[in-house]
Amino acid sequence: MPGPTQTLSPNGENNNDVIHDNGTIIPFRKHTVRGERSYSWGMAVNVYSTSITQETMSRHDIIAWVNDIVCLNYIKVEQLSSGAAYCQFMDMLFPGCISLKKVKFQAKLEHEYIHNFKLLQASFKRMNVDKVIPVEKLVKGRFQDNLDFIQWFKKFFDANYDGKEYDPMEARQGQDALPPPDPGEQIFNLPKKPHHANSPTAGAARSSPIAKPGSTSSRPSSAKKAVPCPSVKSDKDLETQVSHLNEQVHSLKIALEGVEKERDFYFGKLREIELLCQEHGQEGDDLLQRLMDILYSSEEQESHTEQHEGEEEQEHGHEEAEQQEEY
């Protein structure tokens, strides 16, 4: 039974215990040997400031930062409403505090988003993070709600990241992290400003800031960086892809103009033939009448005529065969 200062989660384990994917529970211990360091956490540094400062990143910079750190391909802040990115951030900050196998990285429905945020909230509780997640607002995918939360989480990340290396793709164990569906902005509307992994805004995520007044603990800074993501396309690659697509569109437009000119040319020829037939149509010439019939016939009439001619040829062939048999 737990001591008087311990509390149990609904599943029976201590709130700070590590839960393995197979259900095994490793009790939390503040003082462990070096080999168990990945499962030994102190209390997370809580961040309460939500005001806009000079360190606050724009929507484009914040998405570039998310993609760079955890190897995703998000293009809008609203796509963070799935909660999957936050779950991986927590695994990066506090390895083992959340089971990534339970995270739905390909979530497309609201109840799947809620599932991910429940896992995130459980990891917050396990790490004594005081932040209350506004799940009902975030899963609706509204821009401002998701922007406010990711701005807070960026500050929380900077206050707790110790600079250790982390491979997000390996941590996901092969799970495809597809961005949630979004009918809005397309890939052609991406910002042209490049966001490199070694930029000042992205680099800020790899070192802990100076301790703010009122903070009781801090983590040491480190020069180590997260493992770079080969799967995330840079803005330069996307601009090159857009340029190639624009060239294809231009080539198709030129081909279409050529086809339209050819169409107009032959239409003019047919119009001249039509006028000539109309001028001499009163003479009762059978040839002119047949030309007029061809000019004014529809597709259905042509197909019916071809079918009729085919039947006549078939009947004629049967008659010839019968005559040969008689001989």
Swiss-Prot record:
Originating gene: mapre2
Protein name: Microtubule-associated protein RP/EB family member 2
Cellular compartments per GO CC: cytoplasmic microtubule; microtubule organizing center; microtubule plus-end; spindle midzone
Compositional bias of kind Polar residues: 1-17
Record's comment describing the protein's domains: The N-terminal domain may form a hydrophobic cleft involved in microtubule binding and the C-terminal may be involved in the formation of mutually exclusive complexes with APC and DCTN1.
EB1 C-terminal domain location: 234-304
Pfam family name, one: CH
Domain of life: Eukaryota
Species classification: Eukaryota, Metazoa, Chordata, Craniata, Vertebrata
Family of this protein: Belongs to the MAPRE family.
Summary of the function given for this chain in its UniProt record: May be involved in microtubule polymerization, and spindle function by stabilizing microtubules and anchoring them at centrosomes.
Cross-referenced SUPFAM superfamilies: Calponin-homology domain, CH-domain, EB1 dimerisation domain-like
Signal sequence, renumbered to the chain: none
